A protein has these predicted regions:
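Amphipathic alpha-helical segments
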Residues: 178-199
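Surface-exposed amphipathic alpha-helical segments in non-transmembrane regions
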Residues: 137-161, 165-168, 187-194
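Structural beta->alpha junctions
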Residues: 18, 166-183
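Short, glycine-rich, amphipathic interfacial segments at transmembrane boundaries or analogous
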Residues: 1-16, 105
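Envelope-exposed proteins and targeting segments
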Residues: 17-20, 29, 90-94, 99-101, ...
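Alpha-helical transmembrane helix bundles of large polytopic membrane transport and channel proteins
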Residues: 31-136
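Periplasmic N-terminal gating module of Gram-negative TonB-dependent outer-membrane receptors
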Residues: 21-35
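A short, surface-exposed, charged and often Trp/Pro-enriched helix-loop connector in the C-terminal portion
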Residues: 14-15, 193-214
Length: 214
């Protein structure tokens, strides 16, 4: 797990520390992080089962950065910089495959055909899909892609995130986070702290200092 300390120089009231901990876990703090790192986009390799992931520590996990989401496979890398869907398509699985002319996106009902490196707006049975595919594995190699709801994504973050007061009535809030990829977890945690700092500045809080360490 990776951790960071946020020091509160505004008294040691337990209620204050609890309030700040709740703020850190709130949508107000987490939503900017989710949007910046495209955390609502989920990629997976259907050729790798759950048992394979448990057995192998070398199984690739998706990487989320401001420029997009990527996932390495044995036949190449998937890179997605944009994936927005209508409400009806949220949390629904789609499959992406490379084709001779670009890519095919399907949910089992609708098939959408597009070009690599170009933004597309598709109109499906249940709404619109906006997607930019920058790269995909070799022809025919499938990639599962899902656009999660904001609630689902923030709940997952909070499951992995620990926010506790360090010691007894110290006024110092300690953050730690678990994840399969240490570099990815570090980036998410750092952005959560930065979002918290930004929110404090917007609240006009000049009494709070923050330190982050890994």
């Amino acid at each position: 797990a990776l951790g960071a300390d946020i020091s509160e120089l505004i008294g040691s009231e337990v209620s204050k520390a609890q309030a700040e901990a709740e703020l850190i876990r709130s949508r107000m703090i987490l939503e900017p992080v989710v949007n910046l790192l495209h955390l609502r986009i989920r990629l997976s390799d259907p050729n790798i089962g759950a048992l394979d992931r448990i057995k192998s520590n070398s199984t690739d996990t998706q990487i989320n950065k401001p420029e997009g989401v990527s996932l390495k496979t044995e036949d190449g890398e998937a890179k997605i910089s944009q994936f927005n869907v209508s409400q009806e398509y949220l949390n629904q699985p789609f499959t992406l495959t490379r084709s001779a002319t670009g890519f095919v996106l399907t949910n089992g009902f609708d098939d959408f055909k597009g070009q690599i490196g170009k933004g597309h707006l598709f109109k499906g049975t249940d709404g619109q899909i906006q997607i930019t595919v920058n790269d995909l594995p070799a022809d025919g190699y499938p990639i599962n892609i899902t656009k999660q709801s904001l609630q689902t994504t923030t709940e997952q973050i909070n499951t992995d995130l620990s926010v506790v007061e360090k010691g007894k009535q110290t006024g110092i809030i300690q953050l730690s986070m678990t994840g399969a990829n240490q570099q990815q977890t570090s980036l998410i945690l750092k952005q959560i702290v930065l979002s918290y700092i930004d929110q404090n500045q917007s609240r006009g809080s000049e009494e709070t200092t923050k330190t982050i360490s890994f």
